[in-house]
């Protein structure tokens, strides 16, 4: 109450920000006449003048009024579009590194031009990030002529481009592309084999379009580059056969093999389920008599079993995925689009493939990964724009340090948002939706129906066919036609069913898209035909406006109010009339899981009967409270994911920095020599403990260790017999000299140049190989870390501590393996070095995943998360090696001093 009173007196923070930015807009407006009088040449010359002023230590902020005035004038001349004041407001907010919330149809594409132009002047590059390839291509081609007129180059990053074209696109002043492509290019650059192969420059400034979709909806799904791991696809098929025999436990303590936690989107085997699983495994010969599913040797089976169970119980065809061309293709829950080439990780995708009877592709091992949260925080300056960000303002501020500024609309909003209508059953709800659609269709009012899944859109389509209502369906199966269908969704009486936010970024114009119709005539069409099309379009436009504009129907509430607002925002653009209504039932996911008791109680109190709908502010408020609860829950998960990924991010930063330094270095011989001294010192200390007496020395073991690990044959026992004065320090020096001598001989044979090249190639190969193994170990650690909570330990602290220990061990292994490789491999010519390079490239046959993220407490994942079961740890083949027995690797050392140390 006090806050409301203060904001009435002093204005909200948003009002105060807008007041200060409006002063700058007034300065831009004051320059409009002056710049309109300039010739094209004079206007174009401004770009070089601005760059000279920047070189003379003027700041970008000082250039805002003139630079924005130049872009506005260029927009009028090149595109025939003048930036409105609110668009300039948005541009200044973007330049300030904030998020501009602008309603649908307010021209966000044009808003970005002024901020992109200004920030491209220093020559460090600007990235404009969109949600799909179509929008990146469209926006770059649409705005490209404006930038070109002002002397700036434009590049586009598309998914099918070769590295040369990518590099050229990144060297442009302004580069358009999707979030996935920018993220994958960053990871690919950090797997490159030379600096010349890297395509990206330093990450300077990014404008993220649909920022809520990219930085919030997709924040829990990391980008992963992976390579094939050894895994039997036959096992997935064998285990898949058992799944129909398992029964769900319907009530607590009742019969059944598994329970489902819908809130957490998890499935758990009951005690009876464990016994049943073991029984079917025994019958099929996958387990032996007397074995348990939890024996170390059967952990792999358990991993496959859990993946198969989740595939059958939690993942549904035409909701979470579709089957197309003998492949399981994931459907993006936020956009309803298919994601070809993307795969769920950790065996889940293979289990779904087995369930659907398609070809099973091999399981993958992570080679590189990053979350969008950490990728976008690498930019020196970040800004974003969207139609719906205010509900998530707290998260943007907390995680990205981005403030949301709500920009007023150019024309007043006249859309009517009707209250929710709630029914008892889904059947009644669909019947009411069909009646509403028929009414609008009869009156010539266009309708857009938003659904949460392909299944719902196809069900509604079936009902409309029965009623003989002509309509178009836009979902993941038909997104090739997406822009065309959406562009014409505003024609009189048109009925369009769209999954979620498909077609985002394309405006629905009342009366249909005039530009699209004119384009069908071709460039040489006569004037009369064009005039006829314009006249017909105007008639249609007037008819739609008279019928009430575009009517939006929501078939259920999404977990996030923001996604609902996005659907509403398709109507009422630029002051157009329009209306929206959501139809709900107590059988909807959100209502059933999060709000059913409260709402059904309300309905009973209000005396509701079957077939009746309830429309009441209390109900709407109760639903929004349920949504707030889910949003808070999802925010906690994303925050938790970030806290865990920050640990990996620090390590990733160190490794990538080391890689870049290695690739940039001409000569790494000093580094190799320093590493060699440390590695030999550690090895000698295993057999000759520092400060020990000679009776404690294990000379045969040391000789064997040097020979097996580094190929160095030395007679240390002979040295000691010949020189009784040899003590620990001098012995270390003699061994070091012998190592240096052997290495020097190798260098003499091939020459210094080949050796330097080989050292660099070997270091990069070992670094990449060990980093890949480390990522797998980090995955294993993260999967089980939440169990530490049962031991009264803080899982986050334990994860940080153990991840650091793993990282230290990896660094030691890198040093050891580099020296072992350099010492043992025979190099004769440059061709041998090329062979090492070839091996590294072969090991990098990769696949790109935007896979389901795993959080610490997967048990608290949200309704639509796709967290994967834990990976199977390494399972020993054969008998256990005793700690004092020789290590099976052949080093000659005791197991406890060799590979036993890693355990």
From Swiss-Prot:
Zn(2+) binds at residues 887, 889, 898-899. Gene3D superfamilies: Helical scaffold and wing domains of SecA, P-loop containing nucleotide triphosphate hydrolases, SecA, preprotein cross-linking domain. One of its GO terms (biological process) is protein import. It comes from the Bacteria. Residues 854-893 are annotated as: Disordered. Keywords: ATP-binding, Cell inner membrane, Cell membrane, Cytoplasm, Membrane, Metal-binding, Nucleotide-binding, Protein transport, Translocase, Translocation, Transport, Zinc. One of its GO terms (cellular component) is plasma membrane. Signal peptide: none annotated. ATP binds at residues 87, 105-109, 507. SUPFAM superfamilies: Helical scaffold and wing domains of SecA, P-loop containing nucleoside triphosphate hydrolases, Pre-protein crosslinking domain of SecA. Residues 874-883 have a biased composition (Basic and acidic residues). One of its GO terms (molecular function) is ATP binding. InterPro entries: Helicase_ATP-bd, Helicase_C-like, P-loop_NTPase, SEC_C_motif, SecA, SecA_CS, SecA_DEAD, SecA_motor_DEAD. It is an enzyme of class 7 (translocase). It holds the Pfam family SecA_DEAD. May bind 1 zinc ion per subunit. It catalyses: ATP + H2O + cellular proteinSide 1 = ADP + phosphate + cellular proteinSide 2. Its EC number is 7.4.2.8. It is a peripheral membrane protein. Belongs to the SecA family. Monomer and homodimer. Part of the essential Sec protein translocation apparatus which comprises SecA, SecYEG and auxiliary proteins SecDF-YajC and YidC. This is Protein translocase subunit SecA. It comes from Nitrosococcus oceani (strain ATCC 19707 / BCRC 17464 / JCM 30415 / NCIMB 11848 / C-107). The lineage of its organism: Bacteria, Pseudomonadati, Pseudomonadota, Gammaproteobacteria, Chromatiales. The gene is secA.
